[in-house]
Amino acid sequence: MNKEILAVVEAVSNEKSLPREKIFEALECALAIATKKKYDQEIDVRVKINRKNGNFETFRRWLVVNQVLQPTKEITLEAAKFEDVTVKVNDYIEDKMISVTFDRITTQTAKQVIVQKVREAERAMIVEQFRKYFGKILTGIVKKINRESITLDLGNNAEALILKEDMLPRENFRLGDRVRGVLYAIYPESRGAQLFVTRSKPEMLIELFKIEVPEIGEEIIEIKSAARDPGSRAKIAVKSNDKRVDAVGACVGMRGARVQAVSSELCGERIDIVLWDKNSAQFIINSMAPAEVSSIVLDEDRHTIDIAVDSNNLAQAIGRNGQNVRLASQLSGWEINVMTVDDLKLKHQEEKDKILNIFTKYLKIDQKISNILIDEGFSSIEELVYIPFNELLNINSITQELAYSIRESAKKALCAIELENKKVINERKLHKDLLNLKGMNQKLAFKLAKKNIFSLEDLAEQGIDDLIDIENLNSNTAGMLIMAARNICWFGNKTSA
């Protein structure tokens, strides 16, 4: 029997390309489980196989604890010290026992455990083997095709899955096709597929350019960001770390060879190569190519930007189904609003009129002074309260007396606004759960209360269009707050609170 154990270990190790130690551990576990099944009581067993001659010994063991909860598997520290004075809590006390004899049931149990343990070891080895390829392009042969995914054979018993959402639209594969994709997820504990590959994520575009453009690997050119509408269009932002190298030209290649190679791999996806710029405004203008931008207005606080284009360029700037502006927004990380030059002027005039009315109402100043403050960049009462006084004095046409008057009026106005907000709350109290919502603050809650939104239930019923007119609230934040409220109210997800 001992020689048979060594023969089994050698055979399985060679067949599965697994270390002999892993097979020995699987056998020890299998023999321990088979031994436990011989007893009516639940006991703990350890089996030790001699790696040289195949002999094995079996030990019953007890865990050393302060308080015994399972008498058949645990022993108190005081009792354990009679066996070994050096023993500590969480150590084991062991007694040698009779090793199991290999009858039919024992053999069947051992076989099942060994198969399971070997499979687990194989999966662990595959995960370890491919961990270094995370985020890199893998090539595999199509092994299996179904509606929701395809399975790639990566060799050495390793397989990867490409889900439907990770494929390109209208992409068709046949058995035996060679397919490339980026490894983006590894699940070590998964019972099903462990390796997941994508062809639709921006990482695929980035990795293809790294292959086609040697300057990227040499770090002469740096890829800053990428955005994709998979299979249709993409934008990638690049920057040169060497003034002598044209980043865009290097990525395009001679007669467009490099970008064409990437496009061909992605089923003809049209790719715009954009020059990255540390100036956000210039980068966004570059991102909007091929549309020509007439003027832009950035809102740093809300991280939004209004872009004006000529009316005859509006369709091109927006793109089919908003594709161009959506990709530019993803590429730059800014929320971009595209409109005609006239619409932008009208929008900003409306915003200016709104601020003008607030200033004239609360600060008791004429329109001329209000316009001066607006032209200097002031857009709220709070800014006039907390700005250093010297900055007010430095504004043309603002005397010291007028500056004091504006500051005092602003302080009184701020108090009046707070009282007005408290009145709104007292008339119909704001719910605590709304105030505690992630991303919510008291100032925003007051503004919601003015729109008769006093609870999470009220907020969950709103749409983004209902909230977008609130000052300093962009569509992304509005959408995030609404979804958080819905998750709590409709789906009972308290983690959004």
Curated annotation (Swiss-Prot):
This is Transcription termination/antitermination protein NusA. It comes from the Bacteria. Residues 135-200 form the S1 motif domain. The keyword Cytoplasm applies. Its main location: cytoplasm. Sequence repeats lie at residues 364-414, 439-489. InterPro entries: DNA_repair_Rad51/TF_NusA_a-hlx, KH_dom, KH_dom-like_a/b, KH_dom_NusA-like, KH_sf_prok-type, NA-bd_OB-fold, NusA_bac, NusA_N_sf. Keywords: Cytoplasm, Repeat, RNA-binding, Transcription, Transcription antitermination, Transcription regulation, Transcription termination. Residues 364-489 are annotated as: 2 X 51 AA approximate repeats. SMART domains: KH, S1. One of its GO terms (biological process) is transcription antitermination. GO terms for cellular component: cytosol. Belongs to the NusA family. Monomer. Binds directly to the core enzyme of the DNA-dependent RNA polymerase and to nascent RNA. Participates in both transcription termination and antitermination. Pfam families: HHH_5, KH_5, NusA_N. The gene is nusA. Disulfide bonds: none annotated. It is found in: Cytoplasm. GO terms for molecular function: DNA-binding transcription factor activity; nucleotide binding; RNA binding. Residues 302-372 form the KH domain.
